[in-house]
Amino acid sequence: MLLRFSKMHGLGIDLMVIDLISQYAYIQPQHMRAWSDRRCGVGFARLALIEVPQDPDVDFSCRIFDGDGVEVDWLASDLCCVARLVADKRLISKAQMRVEVRQAVLDVQVHADGSVTVALEKPELLTEPTALAQAFIEQPRHAPWRLDSCFTMLTDNSGSHALLRVVDVMQVPMAELLEHLEAHACLPLGSVISLLQVQSRQTLIVQMWQLGAGVIDSFSPDLCALAVLAMQQGWLDRQAQIECGNGTVSAHLEWLENAPQMYFTGSATRIYEGQIRL
């Protein structure tokens, strides 16, 4: 059979999205692995399946898989793409939707300009200083990235996250900084390192890397945690634009003080429609 699909791009991540409401198919992990191949298949970072929900009070269900065919946790960027497609194809005839995802039901709104707002639970944050080796912090005073005696460690549901506030993220030689971090074992492999530049009270610029893996150029859950921390510290207003990936990825975040939810607004683009033989 020929299976209809859509290719979407949102906030630095490309998705293959399959509507299983208007068509039926039994999709197995080996299919997903073949389709994820960027040379011989469709090529994608993640795959989203739109399905009929189990709960009658929910508009649709969405499951997310990686390129190996393993079901993974959802990202806000996934929901921006899926909700935009559902609205464009009129699978659901309303702008405000309730979406059933892995271990959650989320409220999503598609706006007239195509952007999508997702209501997210505010991350619970723990911050503590982490001492750096003396040899590591003894950098020349003229270095624009000369460090204090410790990073701020931010711990949330996504794991350990070390952040450093700088004047200009573009002046930091990150390859050199990462080399020092790995050499001195200041932080465990897999830790996320973020440089934060507060451009204004409405704009936060972030560069992110993962030790042992490289640059993070898509909108990850860590960015929501960073935005909440910056708001708690008084660096940002309660509504702010967050930019990462050298300015190629941006989203708007709103968090009212002491509110249990925050509102994430991002964009998504439909690249093309296609069919693939199952």
Map each language-model feature to its residues.
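A glycine-rich beta-to-alpha transition motif near the start of alpha/beta enzyme domains, typified by
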Residues: 1-112, 162-278
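N-terminal, positively charged, Ser/Thr/Ala/Gly-biased leader segments
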Residues: 1-24, 132-156
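Short, flexible active-site-adjacent loop segments at beta-strand->alpha-helix junctions, enriched
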Residues: 103, 122-124
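Intrinsically disordered, low-complexity regions enriched in acidic/Ser/Thr/Pro/Gln residues
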Residues: 116-120
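C-terminal domain-closing interface element
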Residues: 126-147, 155-156, 260-278
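Selected transmembrane alpha-helices and immediately adjacent juxtamembrane segments
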Residues: 152-153, 160-164
